[in-house]
Amino acid sequence: MSASWQQGTIRTRSRGTATPAPLVIKVGGSLLGRIDWPQLVGALISAVEREAAADRGCLLVVGGGGVVESLRSSDARWPQPPERMHQAAIDVMGATGWLAARLLGLPLVAEPDQATGRATSVLDVPAWLGREHRFERLPVGWDVTSDSIAACVAASEGSGLLLAKSVPPPEAGDCQTLADRGWVDHYFPQAAKPLDEIAWACPRSVPPPAVGGAGGDRGRAAALIG
């Protein structure tokens, strides 16, 4: 792993032969509040690519960051139709995914196999969910965040999942324990059931000053799921 990141394992199950599917990396929206996030994420991608098989790249699912946290806070104070807020949060992930693709120099794709000539890409989450009735199969509400969406992507691809967040898990434990502690969303244990490989990573360094108030952390205990 990169010297910029620390990592750990949440789940590993033997599945015989290694999968050629790209490793799904959920880039926590809270990381987007760091002024150095493109360099950090780029270093993480490079480290994963070095350690993986030559034909296995990465597929990034980018969280919504501070904008989604603002939607969540506003909805708690002035409740709106759940379906509308659900769609709004997913639309924000489309914007953060577009930005990540631009700043990292990666293709933005609606399906992993559309990354022509590039093993690593950023997923256009709204476009991906809009295909094959995926959006309709996803529960509506704040119990589902980019954590669960990334798990659904990994399950669909038969891939592993790396959760890149601002802080490490509060304690060792299974997915249900992490959901109970607020490190992943409440639906994540269900979404992640098919996955054989789940790991985490977080930056080793103290974050530089946030960019104009962006960022998804609501303190260490909440961190978590943006």
Named regions from a protein language model:
Residues M1-A210, R218-R220, I225:
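Nucleotide/pyrophosphate-binding catalytic subdomain
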